[in-house]
Each structure stands twice: as structure tokens, then as C-alpha cells.
Amino acid sequence: MEPILNQGYGYGFALGLGAAFALLMAIITKVLTACMGQTQNSERFSTASRSVKSGLISSSTVSAWTWPATLLSSGAWSYTYGIMGGFMYGVGGTIQITLFLFLAIQIKKKAPAAHTVSECFFIRFGKLGHCVYLFYCISTNVLVSSLLLLGGSQGFSSTTGMNTVAACFLLPLGVMVYTTLGGLKATFISDWIHTVMIYIILIVTCYTVYCSSSLIGSPAKMYDMLKEVQEVYPATGGQSYLSFKNSEMMYLTWSVMIGGLSSVFGDPGYSQRAIASDAKSVFQGYLMGGLCWWIIPMALGSSAGLACRALLLNPASVTYPNVLSSVEISSGLPVIYGMASIFGKSGAAAGLVMLFMSITSATSAELIAFSSVTTYDIFRAYINPAANGKQLVRTAHLSVIGFSLFIGALSVGFNYAGVTAGWLLTFLGIILTPEVSAVTLCLFWNKMTRFSLVVGAPFGTITGVVCWLASTYSFCDGIVNKDTVMTSKACFVGNIVSMASSPLYIVLLSYIWPDKETFDLNQFRNITVGDDIDTTELNAIVSQLKDERILKLQTYWSIGINLFILIGCYVIIPTALLGSNHDLSKSSFSGLIIVCLIWILVAAIYIILFPLWQGRKSLANVISHIIRLKAPENILLDGLTPKQSSEDVGDATSFHMDKLDKEKEKSSELKTA
């Protein structure tokens, strides 16, 4: 079948929108420098001064987690499995974010001066343990980045006929430019802009499908149409598009959820957001980010994805009178075709805009994360420990440029090898899930040893891969190849074994060969900052040390929330509906859709307006300086001037740490008395 759009759309979006965003972020970076005195030093480039508020953290979390797979796979799942597809995709992704929230709080609490999580491994386990974790960390970074470009380039190629090789190199081009110019702060701002555009398109799509479209126009009409199409084109496994009774879908969603944990816990892009956030904002930022993200795959799948299925018997369908081929489904085209059926070619173009936004926003997070790891965990740790701020910034810039070219080339290789985004996502989870337990135990368990990390994590990977291939051999009558290893049951076995075996190995080895002395977790505070840190950034680090009581309370809240979402929303509700063996009633289906329509509006209002409200003073300051052409005012802390040396900055940090320790000792003495 011919692409629904011509190549001009593909090249126009990749080059035109990419150049527009690069220019916009260059202007914003210039304005921040001129109006707020935010020069691009090493700390600001990698950590955004550790002062980002919860609103931007939420929008950035939504942006970073809205992969091309979020948009395309949620629609494909809904098209294939019905209403449960978008729901299960959304809940599975949300639990990954809320679980990471628990870890993010510990990063702020125990390593306030960290630039990357892997720095904690260097402090605790030395060079050998650090290198082992770096392998997992960088592998996650590389594979996730390739996954983003692979899914995006294949989506662009299928929709417009654009050359896949050209897409792999042109899509990250604009991202590379504005990330190099603006660093992490520019990434946060661009993430907000990307997310705003995605929400606007999504709201228009959902409300048109269920409220005003002449083809569907109401949840009740969608319900009836799905009933009709079920008679002609039954759902996978002979089940209904209006029920949750599909065991294959359950295996698939659990496999993707478990495997996806590695792309959250191990991907330095997510920890960068925790490091960049204000200590009081990390809880609200990640929690609201997860809740606002859930509605994107749910709403898109239940609108465009279900519309593509429901309209198969209508001449408005792009593929009428045929169903979509397996290639079209695996390419994620149900979303594009569904929007095209409702809006015409403008709908397909809008879907392509959403796809472009998801590619560039998530890729920018990966670029800045890789640059931070390269700068602080490789260059400063092994090549030049005495590197000054300018050298760190230069290394970060070169890392962004080099990594952009590398992942473009790697994505081309994957494409020619016949690897799809879904295949790569499953493979990534099975080989890299052991890093979930490694980073969790590193931050929480003081008895974990270097030997257990060096041996336990790789053994977890080996065990997972062996069980994955053995399960494929068993479930597929002895046939093991690139296609059969994607069997949902085999993927589930590989992911669950890889995740569960690693902590077992680490704990057992730590008890069998323990260290002479247990590790003091307070040593994570020994991580040093760059010599070009200014007083605003120092202020942020010191304030984190003072917020420890708040972070402790948020830890308990995060445990409760994760238990509710994991057990209630991800286990009890789906299994209860699975066991009911009935379709949703028309009123239940309509009620679920109405909840989605309300949720998407509330999420959009929060993501779009709340960051503007939190940043109103900064916006007013920028506007005031532009109008009056005033010179920027520098913020001072405890009498320190912005040009003081790094020794003075370090002394100030140590002073505040010592002061806090004395206050804790005094408090404990009073409690004892």
C-alpha cells in the first residue's frame, strides 16, 4: 500500500520543525543568559542548577516517557486487543515512573551533589564496580536512543515514504543543535513545548472521535461499531474488543512493564531529572508526571486506535475493505490511519507531528544524559580528575555531537538487520533489567559488596537470556529465530527471570563473601561539584541538605502510592476483569471513555499552565529586563560572591553539612533525654 502522505511531509517536518526548535532554543538560551545571568557553566549544563520546580519536572517526565512506542504501540495494542490495550499500556508505563519516584527521592536525599547515579557506584565500589555499572548504564542509553530513532524513522518511512536512513540522521539533527547550545535547562523548556503540542492534538482527536465526528460521535456508537466489527474480524484469540479476557495481552503487558523498568532505573536520562529538580519538587513532579502520562496512551489508543478498528467496515477506512497487514500493525500505523479516517490527510499530518515531538523530546533527554555520563563518569573520573569547568562543558558538547551521529548510524544498522522497535524493547529489558536491583541495592543496602555487583548483575543477564531462549524452544516446537523469540510467554519468562535472579545473586554473594566493614551511605555526599559552580547552584545543594525531613516523609508516601497502583490498578482490576469472562456493558464502556475525556483535560491544564504559574516571577523578570534592558542581578548566598573560588564554595557546602550534622546530634540527644 502507498504511504498515506508524500515524502515532503517527512522531510519538511524533520528539517523544518527541527530547525525551528533549534532556533527557538538558541534564542531562549540567549535570553536566559542576558536577562537572568544564567551563563552555561558545567553544573548548569548537566544539572540545570538543581532548582527545577515540580511543574517542569512533570512536563519533562511526560515528554521523556512519551516515546514513539507510546503513541504507536498503544494504538496498535488497542487495534489488536481492544479497550484493554491502551489501558494496560498506560498502567504498565505509569508504575515504572512511580517506582522510580521512590529511587529519585533517595538520590536527592543521599547524594545531593551528584551529576549522575553512576557517580555513586564510583564512590562505593571503586573503578571495577563503577565500570560494570557504566556498561549497563551506557548500554541502556545507547539502546533506548536507538529504539527512539528506530521506531520514529520506521514510522516516518511507513507514513510518508521517507528514506529510513535519511530519517535516522535528520530527526536528531535539530535536537543535537539545541541540546548542545542550551544543555539540560533548554531540554526542560523544549520538553514543555513538545508536551503542550502533543496534548493539544490529543484533546482534539479524543473529543472529535467521541463528541462531534459524523462517523462515530459518541461512546455508545463506538461500542456498537466494535460489536459489529467483532462479528466480521474477531479479536486475537477469539475474544472481544470490549473485554479484558485475553491472556496473551496480559503476558505482553507484564513483559513490557518489567523490561521497561531497566529503561527507567538504568537510563541516566530519568535520574538527570531527579538530580535537576528542587528537593521539595521531586515527589510532586514525578507523581503528577506519571498520572498525566497515563492518559496519553490510554486516550490515544481508545480514540484513534479503536477508531481504526471500528471503521474497518466503513469506506472512510484507509484500508477499506481490508484489515491492516501485520507489517502495518507492527509499524504502529493504526493511530495514523485512525486519525486519517476521522480528519483526512490533516489527521495523518497531525499524527506525524505528535510522532516528531515524541522522537525529539525523548532523544534530547538521552543526549544530555549521555553527555553527563561521559563528562563526569569517564572524562573526570579516569582521564582528567582535575578538569575545570570549561573543559567539562567542552567534553559535554562533543559528547552530544558524537552520540547523535553514533545512534543515527546504529539505528540504520538495526533497520537493515530487520529489527523492529518492539523487538529491541524486549531485548533491552532481558539483558539490562539486572541494573534495577543493582542501583536500588547500591543506594539502600549498606552490606552490598563490590564482588556481588561485579558477578551478580552479569549472572542475572546470563540467566535471563538462557531462560528466554529455552522458553522459546519449548513454546515454539524447537524453533528459535528472530521471530519466535518474540513469543509473549517466552519474553515474559526472560524478563521476570532476569529481574528476579540478579538481586538473589547480589544478596547471596554479599552474605557469603561480605566486606570487613559495611559501607557508610553518607559517603555519597562526598561527590564534588565543578569549580565553576555559582552561588545559585550552591544554594540549591545546601537547601537539599535542609529538606531531609520532607524527603523522608515523601519516601513513605511513595511506598503507599506504588502499592496502590501496582496491586490495585495493575493486578486486581485487570485480573478481576479477566476472570469475569464478560464484555464491558455499554454504560461501563461509556463511563470509562468519559473518565478519559475528563482526565485528558485536567492533565493538559496541569502540564500546560502549572509550570507557567510556578515560573511567573522568572517570566516577569525576563520581560522586565527585555523592556528596560537592565543588566542581570546576581543572587548571593551567605556573603559569597559569584566569582569566588571552588575552594570557598566547597568550604561553604562543608559548613552547611557540618551544621546539619550537629543539629541532628542535638536533636537525638534531646530525644534520648
Swiss-Prot record:
Topology relative to the membrane: Multi-pass membrane protein
One GO molecular-function entry: urea transmembrane transporter activity
GO BP terms: putrescine transport; spermidine transport; urea transmembrane transport; urea transport
Any single GO CC term annotated in Swiss-Prot or TrEMBL for this entry: plasma membrane
CDD domains found in the cross-reference section: SLC5sbd_DUR3
Location(s), subcellular: Endoplasmic reticulum membrane
Keywords: Endoplasmic reticulum, Membrane, Transmembrane, Transmembrane helix, Transport
Source taxon at top rank: Eukaryota
Principal location listed in the UniProt entry: endoplasmic reticulum
TM segment ranges: 8-28, 83-103, 132-152, 164-184, 196-218, 249-269, 287-307, 336-356, 391-411, 424-446, 451-471, 492-512, 559-579, 592-612
Family (UniProt): Belongs to the sodium:solute symporter (SSF) (TC 2.A.21) family.
Primary role: Involved in active transport of urea.
Record protein name field: Probable urea active transporter 2
Organism: Schizosaccharomyces pombe (strain 972 / ATCC 24843) (Fission yeast)
Organismal lineage: Eukaryota, Fungi, Dikarya, Ascomycota, Taphrinomycotina
